[in-house]
């Protein structure tokens, strides 16, 4: 097998692993109360940073580019909304919506050279356009799928640990998400999923920018590595730094009485590890296939995995109409992913 063929094979294998882990990484958290998600966000990001540290040591500590941290900051900002999204519209539908907008944003920025990037070319542009277009179509179909999320009773069994020791203070164990009406649940959940998807789709822009400008002698990034995984430590450091800043701001806003859920620590850590491994696979896929190919594939696939969890494990999606819409959306996603994959060959 030629080097190019080996790269393609390795890239598609990386895509498969990333899809499987991205679609499953929030499953450990589903059975635990996570409150408003701010504490969980910090735990998850701490686990992500530890994985990055291990990868960085394995790669013998490549040069650290601070600008690559910006992508991590963008991702952490979008990730704040994950818990509210899951609580309002469910795991399956949430990942389906934000994955579709993630795909569109990431693909368009690479294909057309947004944000100062070099526009990427593919062997068959028509197939690539069709693949990206089908991702957009699937996103609109997902918006019509209704998920059934159990109402949170806000029992004292799920009261945050830290509030049990506060004397003469009355705190509502419910988060703001739990107080939303059914109609507002769907509006807020879908809106947050779209915003998170756009932010997620922009997360690799700083790294691709550095790689593109490393080929120019007059750039401050001249000579920078072309291997995407060399930037994982800077990227993940940006994630952890940003999540820490947000968590401290949250503690200040809560007057030093944040809602901490100790039972969510280990599941949150596991979720972070799964996400970090999946993202490392995505970095490898970007290097082997290019972002214009990897984005539509990796961002569309996890929705299928998450929806299977939502249907068979958590019973979030029910009814013949919803099942038919899901099947239609999956067929569109599969067709789009195949078109995108073959556009590289």
From Swiss-Prot:
Compartment(s) where it occurs, according to its Swiss-Prot or TrEMBL record: Membrane
Lipid bilayer topology: Multi-pass membrane protein
Keywords of this entry: Membrane, Transmembrane, Transmembrane helix
Cellular compartments per GO CC: membrane
Molecular functions (GO terms): carbohydrate transmembrane transporter activity
Any Pfam family the entry gives: TMEM144
Segments passing through the bilayer: 8-28, 39-59, 64-86, 93-115, 125-145, 190-210, 232-252, 264-284, 292-312, 323-343
Chief location category: membrane
InterPro entries hit by this protein: Sugar_transport (IPR010651), TMEM144 (IPR012435)
Domain of life: Eukaryota
The family this protein is said to belong to: Belongs to the TMEM144 family.
Protein name: Transmembrane protein 144
Upper lineage: Eukaryota, Metazoa, Chordata, Craniata, Vertebrata
């Amino acid at each position: 097998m030629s080097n190019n063929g080996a790269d393609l094979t390795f890239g598609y294998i990386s895509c498969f692993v990333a899809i499987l882990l991205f679609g499953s990484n929030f499953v450990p958290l589903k059975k635990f109360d996570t409150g408003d998600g701010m504490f969980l966000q910090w735990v998850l990001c701490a686990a992500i940073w530890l994985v990055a540290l291990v990868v960085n040591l394995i790669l013998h500590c490549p040069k650290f580019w601070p600008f690559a941290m910006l992508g991590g900051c963008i991702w952490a900002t979008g990730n704040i909304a994950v818990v509210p999204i899951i609580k309002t519209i469910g795991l399956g539908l949430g990942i389906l919506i934000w994955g579709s907008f993630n795909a569109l944003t990431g693909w368009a920025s690479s294909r057309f050279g947004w944000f100062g990037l070099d526009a990427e070319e593919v062997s068959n542009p028509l197939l690539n356009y069709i693949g990206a277009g089908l991702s957009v179509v699937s996103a609109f179909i997902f918006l019509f799928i209704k998920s059934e999320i159990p109402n949170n009773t806000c029992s004292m069994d799920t009261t945050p640990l830290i509030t049990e020791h506060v004397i003469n203070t009355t705190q509502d164990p419910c988060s703001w998400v739990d107080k939303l009406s059914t109609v507002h649940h769907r509006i807020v959940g879908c809106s947050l999923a779209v915003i998170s998807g756009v932010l997620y789709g922009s997360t690799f822009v700083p790294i691709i920018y550095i790689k593109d400008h490393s080929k120019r002698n007059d750039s401050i990034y001249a000579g920078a590595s072309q291997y995407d995984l060399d930037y994982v430590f800077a990227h993940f450091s940006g994630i952890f730094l940003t999540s820490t800043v947000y968590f401290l701001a949250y503690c200040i806003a809560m007057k030093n009485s944040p809602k901490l859920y100790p039972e969510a620590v280990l599941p949150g850590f596991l979720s972070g590890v799964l996400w970090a491994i999946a993202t490392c696979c995505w970095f490898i896929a970007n290097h082997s296939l290019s972002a214009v190919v990897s984005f539509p594939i990796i961002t569309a696939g996890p929705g299928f995995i998450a929806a299977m969890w939502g249907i068979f494990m958590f019973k979030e999606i029910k009814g013949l109409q919803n099942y038919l819409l899901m099947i239609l959306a999956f067929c569109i996603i599969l067709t789009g992913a195949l078109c995108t994959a073959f556009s590289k060959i």
